[in-house]
């Protein structure tokens, strides 16, 4: 007999955050989020509360053990932006048991019906700055710190409940060709930069770089990602939090921007050192031993995770894609490979760029959709 309880106590909050750590204990591919960041979402002043409402549920077996969890989100800003009537599900984790999944999703779906919304989609977090998508290919690969890992049986549990594909994301692993990028690409890049009087910013100091460009970068993220699936505008509070979180990970050599003659950014790429293994060993807790493991990975990583890449709108149709390739190559020059993280499968402009590198498409993630109030025939 499985019972479902809404998370209302501090004890349950800790159980909610702890459960995936227990479920994936010993798994070589799972990388947890930071434990403190997950607990923070229960605080009344959580950064997303100004644009979203949330509910959390736990599933217990007859012995009182946690066997599953799920979160529901009413992302008001997303519904307003896209003209939709949706809730999102996220942070679904469970043992391989149909009853557990059925009852967890039933709880979230009923919450959505009480709110009067028409659809449920997910896995999607509060924004695309959170982990999103259900892994359906690539279970043998280590997850990046930015993305979620899940067992392969999740797909069956979810699809058996009537959920259907809404969108897929693809992930690639890129390597720099021996000898660097093709000479023709380098010539095209140079011509492109000269034609529009563009150049790479060469500010050495990370502090000076952020002071000079951080506001531009956030504006460009909002602009260049505006039309992508499920995105919501960045609030000022969220920008402040993201900057605080990213300062731990950001290294100057993994941020590359192309600027015009007025020092305005026209294209950018941001990568994070791959820290999955270090976080994996700590269970997401930033202890002193964890920090000691992190430092070498931050300064001399084997892998760089591509976090963000974008072009200013007016330059998208000017053919500056060749100039973006050296930008990425610079980020990859000191590592074994780059993880692209999520690219929508129909984002051909981005995916075509990967053809100029050694590239394997090794992971696929899916966002599902289900009608909560289907029309009666």
State each model region's role.
Residues 2-3:
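Extreme N-terminal starter segment of soluble prokaryotic enzymes
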Residues 66, 76-79, 128-130, 179, ...:
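Flexible loop/turn segments at secondary-structure boundaries
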Residues 148-229:
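Acyltransferase donor/substrate-recognition loop-hinge adjacent to the catalytic core
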Residues 356-367, 375:
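A structural motif corresponding to the C-terminal lobe/cap of the Radical SAM core domain
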